[in-house]
Amino acid sequence: MVVYNLNRGIGWASSGVEYAQAYRSEVFRKLGVEAKFIFTDMFQNENIEHLTRNIGFEDNEIIWLYTFFTDLTIAATSYSLQQLKESFSLPIDRTEKNGKIISFFFKGSSIVVTVMLNDESSNIVQRVEYLMGGKLVRKDYYSYTKMFSEYYAPEDIGPCLYQRTFYNEDGSVAYEENVDGENSIFKFKETILYSKEELVGYMLEKLQLTNSDLILLDRSTGIGQAVLRNKGNAKVAVVVHAEHYNVSATDETTILWNNYYDYQFSNADSIDAFITSTETQTKTLIDQFKKYLNIEPVVYTIPVGSLSKLQRKEWHERKAFSLLTCSRLASEKHIDWLINAVVEANKVIPELTFDIYGEGGERQKLQEIIAKNKANNYIRLMGHKNLSSVYKDYQVYLSGSTSEGFGLTLMEAIGSGLPIIGLDVPYGNQTFIENNLNGYLIPRETPDNPQQISTAFAQYIVALFNSKDICKKHEYSYRIASRFLNDKIIENWSFFLRRLLNDYTI
């Protein structure tokens, strides 16, 4: 039995989906269940191994679509600059170094080889670009050996990618991809595939799936049809990570599904089970399937994360009046609302501090808001860090998100005993915040009024720190968190796998 977890991408600032998969990988290891995590995006700027290892996966758990058809294994980049130099056929005339970029110039040739190292102090090669007459013609990508090459044709608007060649360990060609804008044709010795979707289907065919295997769809945009067509005898389950429908566009007769789940829901008769993270979402989904589609699919509730232990630290040992939030710095997380709230609350409690963990596209905007309010001395952007032992140094957690399918950081926050202030929205906040017991759920009125919301957050921040029972709220967070300890989630997954696969040895 193998559980194949299907996703698209992963990055340094990963989303909750990737963190949910990382938690799941730990559970499957403890259950002794073989699990593979398949990523189907193209990775050019970073070796996928660095990204998956960073979040907690083991190398032998990872399948990358593009190296699946080669004999390469997932491994950290180790190809050295010396190895590359030994491969040059022309004598080096001179070199130029700028940070982690080294350029080689050759005697009597217009060829320039530009090398991107892992970092400035490293001699490990990540990518090599070949320029001829100042025009880009090829890029090579490395891990412990050359993984693939890209070939470019010069055009007026810049270099145009037209081909990728993927290699085996001995340097032989495994297959080629002909690229025409967004379209690709994949050429193998034995077959030709006319789309990426067909490539995914071919991978599943090669896996020779049996009725003891399971495919868990975490993300399936653009590949859902290929999965259902090529699943063989394997079971298929869909993991719902977010709000699954558009509330404002749904009425008594029509529902608008979240486009990430529309294909799966529309083909629910081909899905063996759905998984949500909360009982509330499970009930909502079951009711909606019955009402709008007149079907009764199997829906399980399994939290996407779990806690290995409660991170204990007494309230008075934490930094006084300290707040934090942790998320991607994205517009839907509404960190700007929280910054403005803390600025307002700071006028009442000047000792307040607010640390914001995470990275993302909103970083510059948020930094400007902090600077505009002259709040640099008490509001900080902390970047992306491992927070497992950080939460317990703080006293209160803030959540500005208007929708969380589960909210892993919320779970981690209460696991460290933090009261939480957040909006009264499904599903994470309503799962981890019990109003007045371990924090506050702020009523949300639509459309959102950012100023009113920030003011409400400020008022609740002040109220919480002035509360005489704040230590009780701190302890109540631990009480809620105990429901999400590893043993409980392991039992949930064990029950699910036994039932779905009819395998009671798990």
Swiss-Prot record:
Keywords: Cell membrane, Cytoplasm, Glycosyltransferase, Membrane, Nucleotide-binding, Transferase. The keyword Cell membrane applies. Interacts with stabilizing protein GtfB (Gtf2), probably as a heterotetramer with 2 subunits each of GtfA and GtfB, part of the accessory SecA2/SecY2 protein translocation apparatus. This is UDP-N-acetylglucosamine--peptide N-acetylglucosaminyltransferase GtfA subunit. It is a peripheral membrane protein. Its main location: cytoplasm. N-acetyl-D-glucosamine binds at H241, E404, G405, F406, G407. Its EC number is 2.4.1.-. Required for polymorphic O-glycosylation of the serine-rich repeat protein Srr2. Catalyzes the first step in glycosylation by transferring N-acetylglucosamine from UDP-GlcNAc to serine residues of Srr2. Part of the accessory SecA2/SecY2 system specifically required to export serine-rich repeat proteins, probably Srr2 in this organism. The GtfA-GtfB (Gtf1-Gtf2 in this bacteria) complex adds GlcNAc from UDP-GlcNAc to Srr2 substrate. This subunit has low glycosyltransferase activity; GtfB enhances glycosyltransferase activity in vitro. GO terms for biological process: protein O-linked glycosylation via serine. It is found in: Cytoplasm; Cell membrane. It catalyses: L-seryl-[protein] + UDP-N-acetyl-alpha-D-glucosamine = 3-O-[N-acetyl-alpha-D-glucosaminyl]-L-seryl-[protein] + UDP + H(+). UDP binds at G16, V17, E18, Y19, H384, K385.
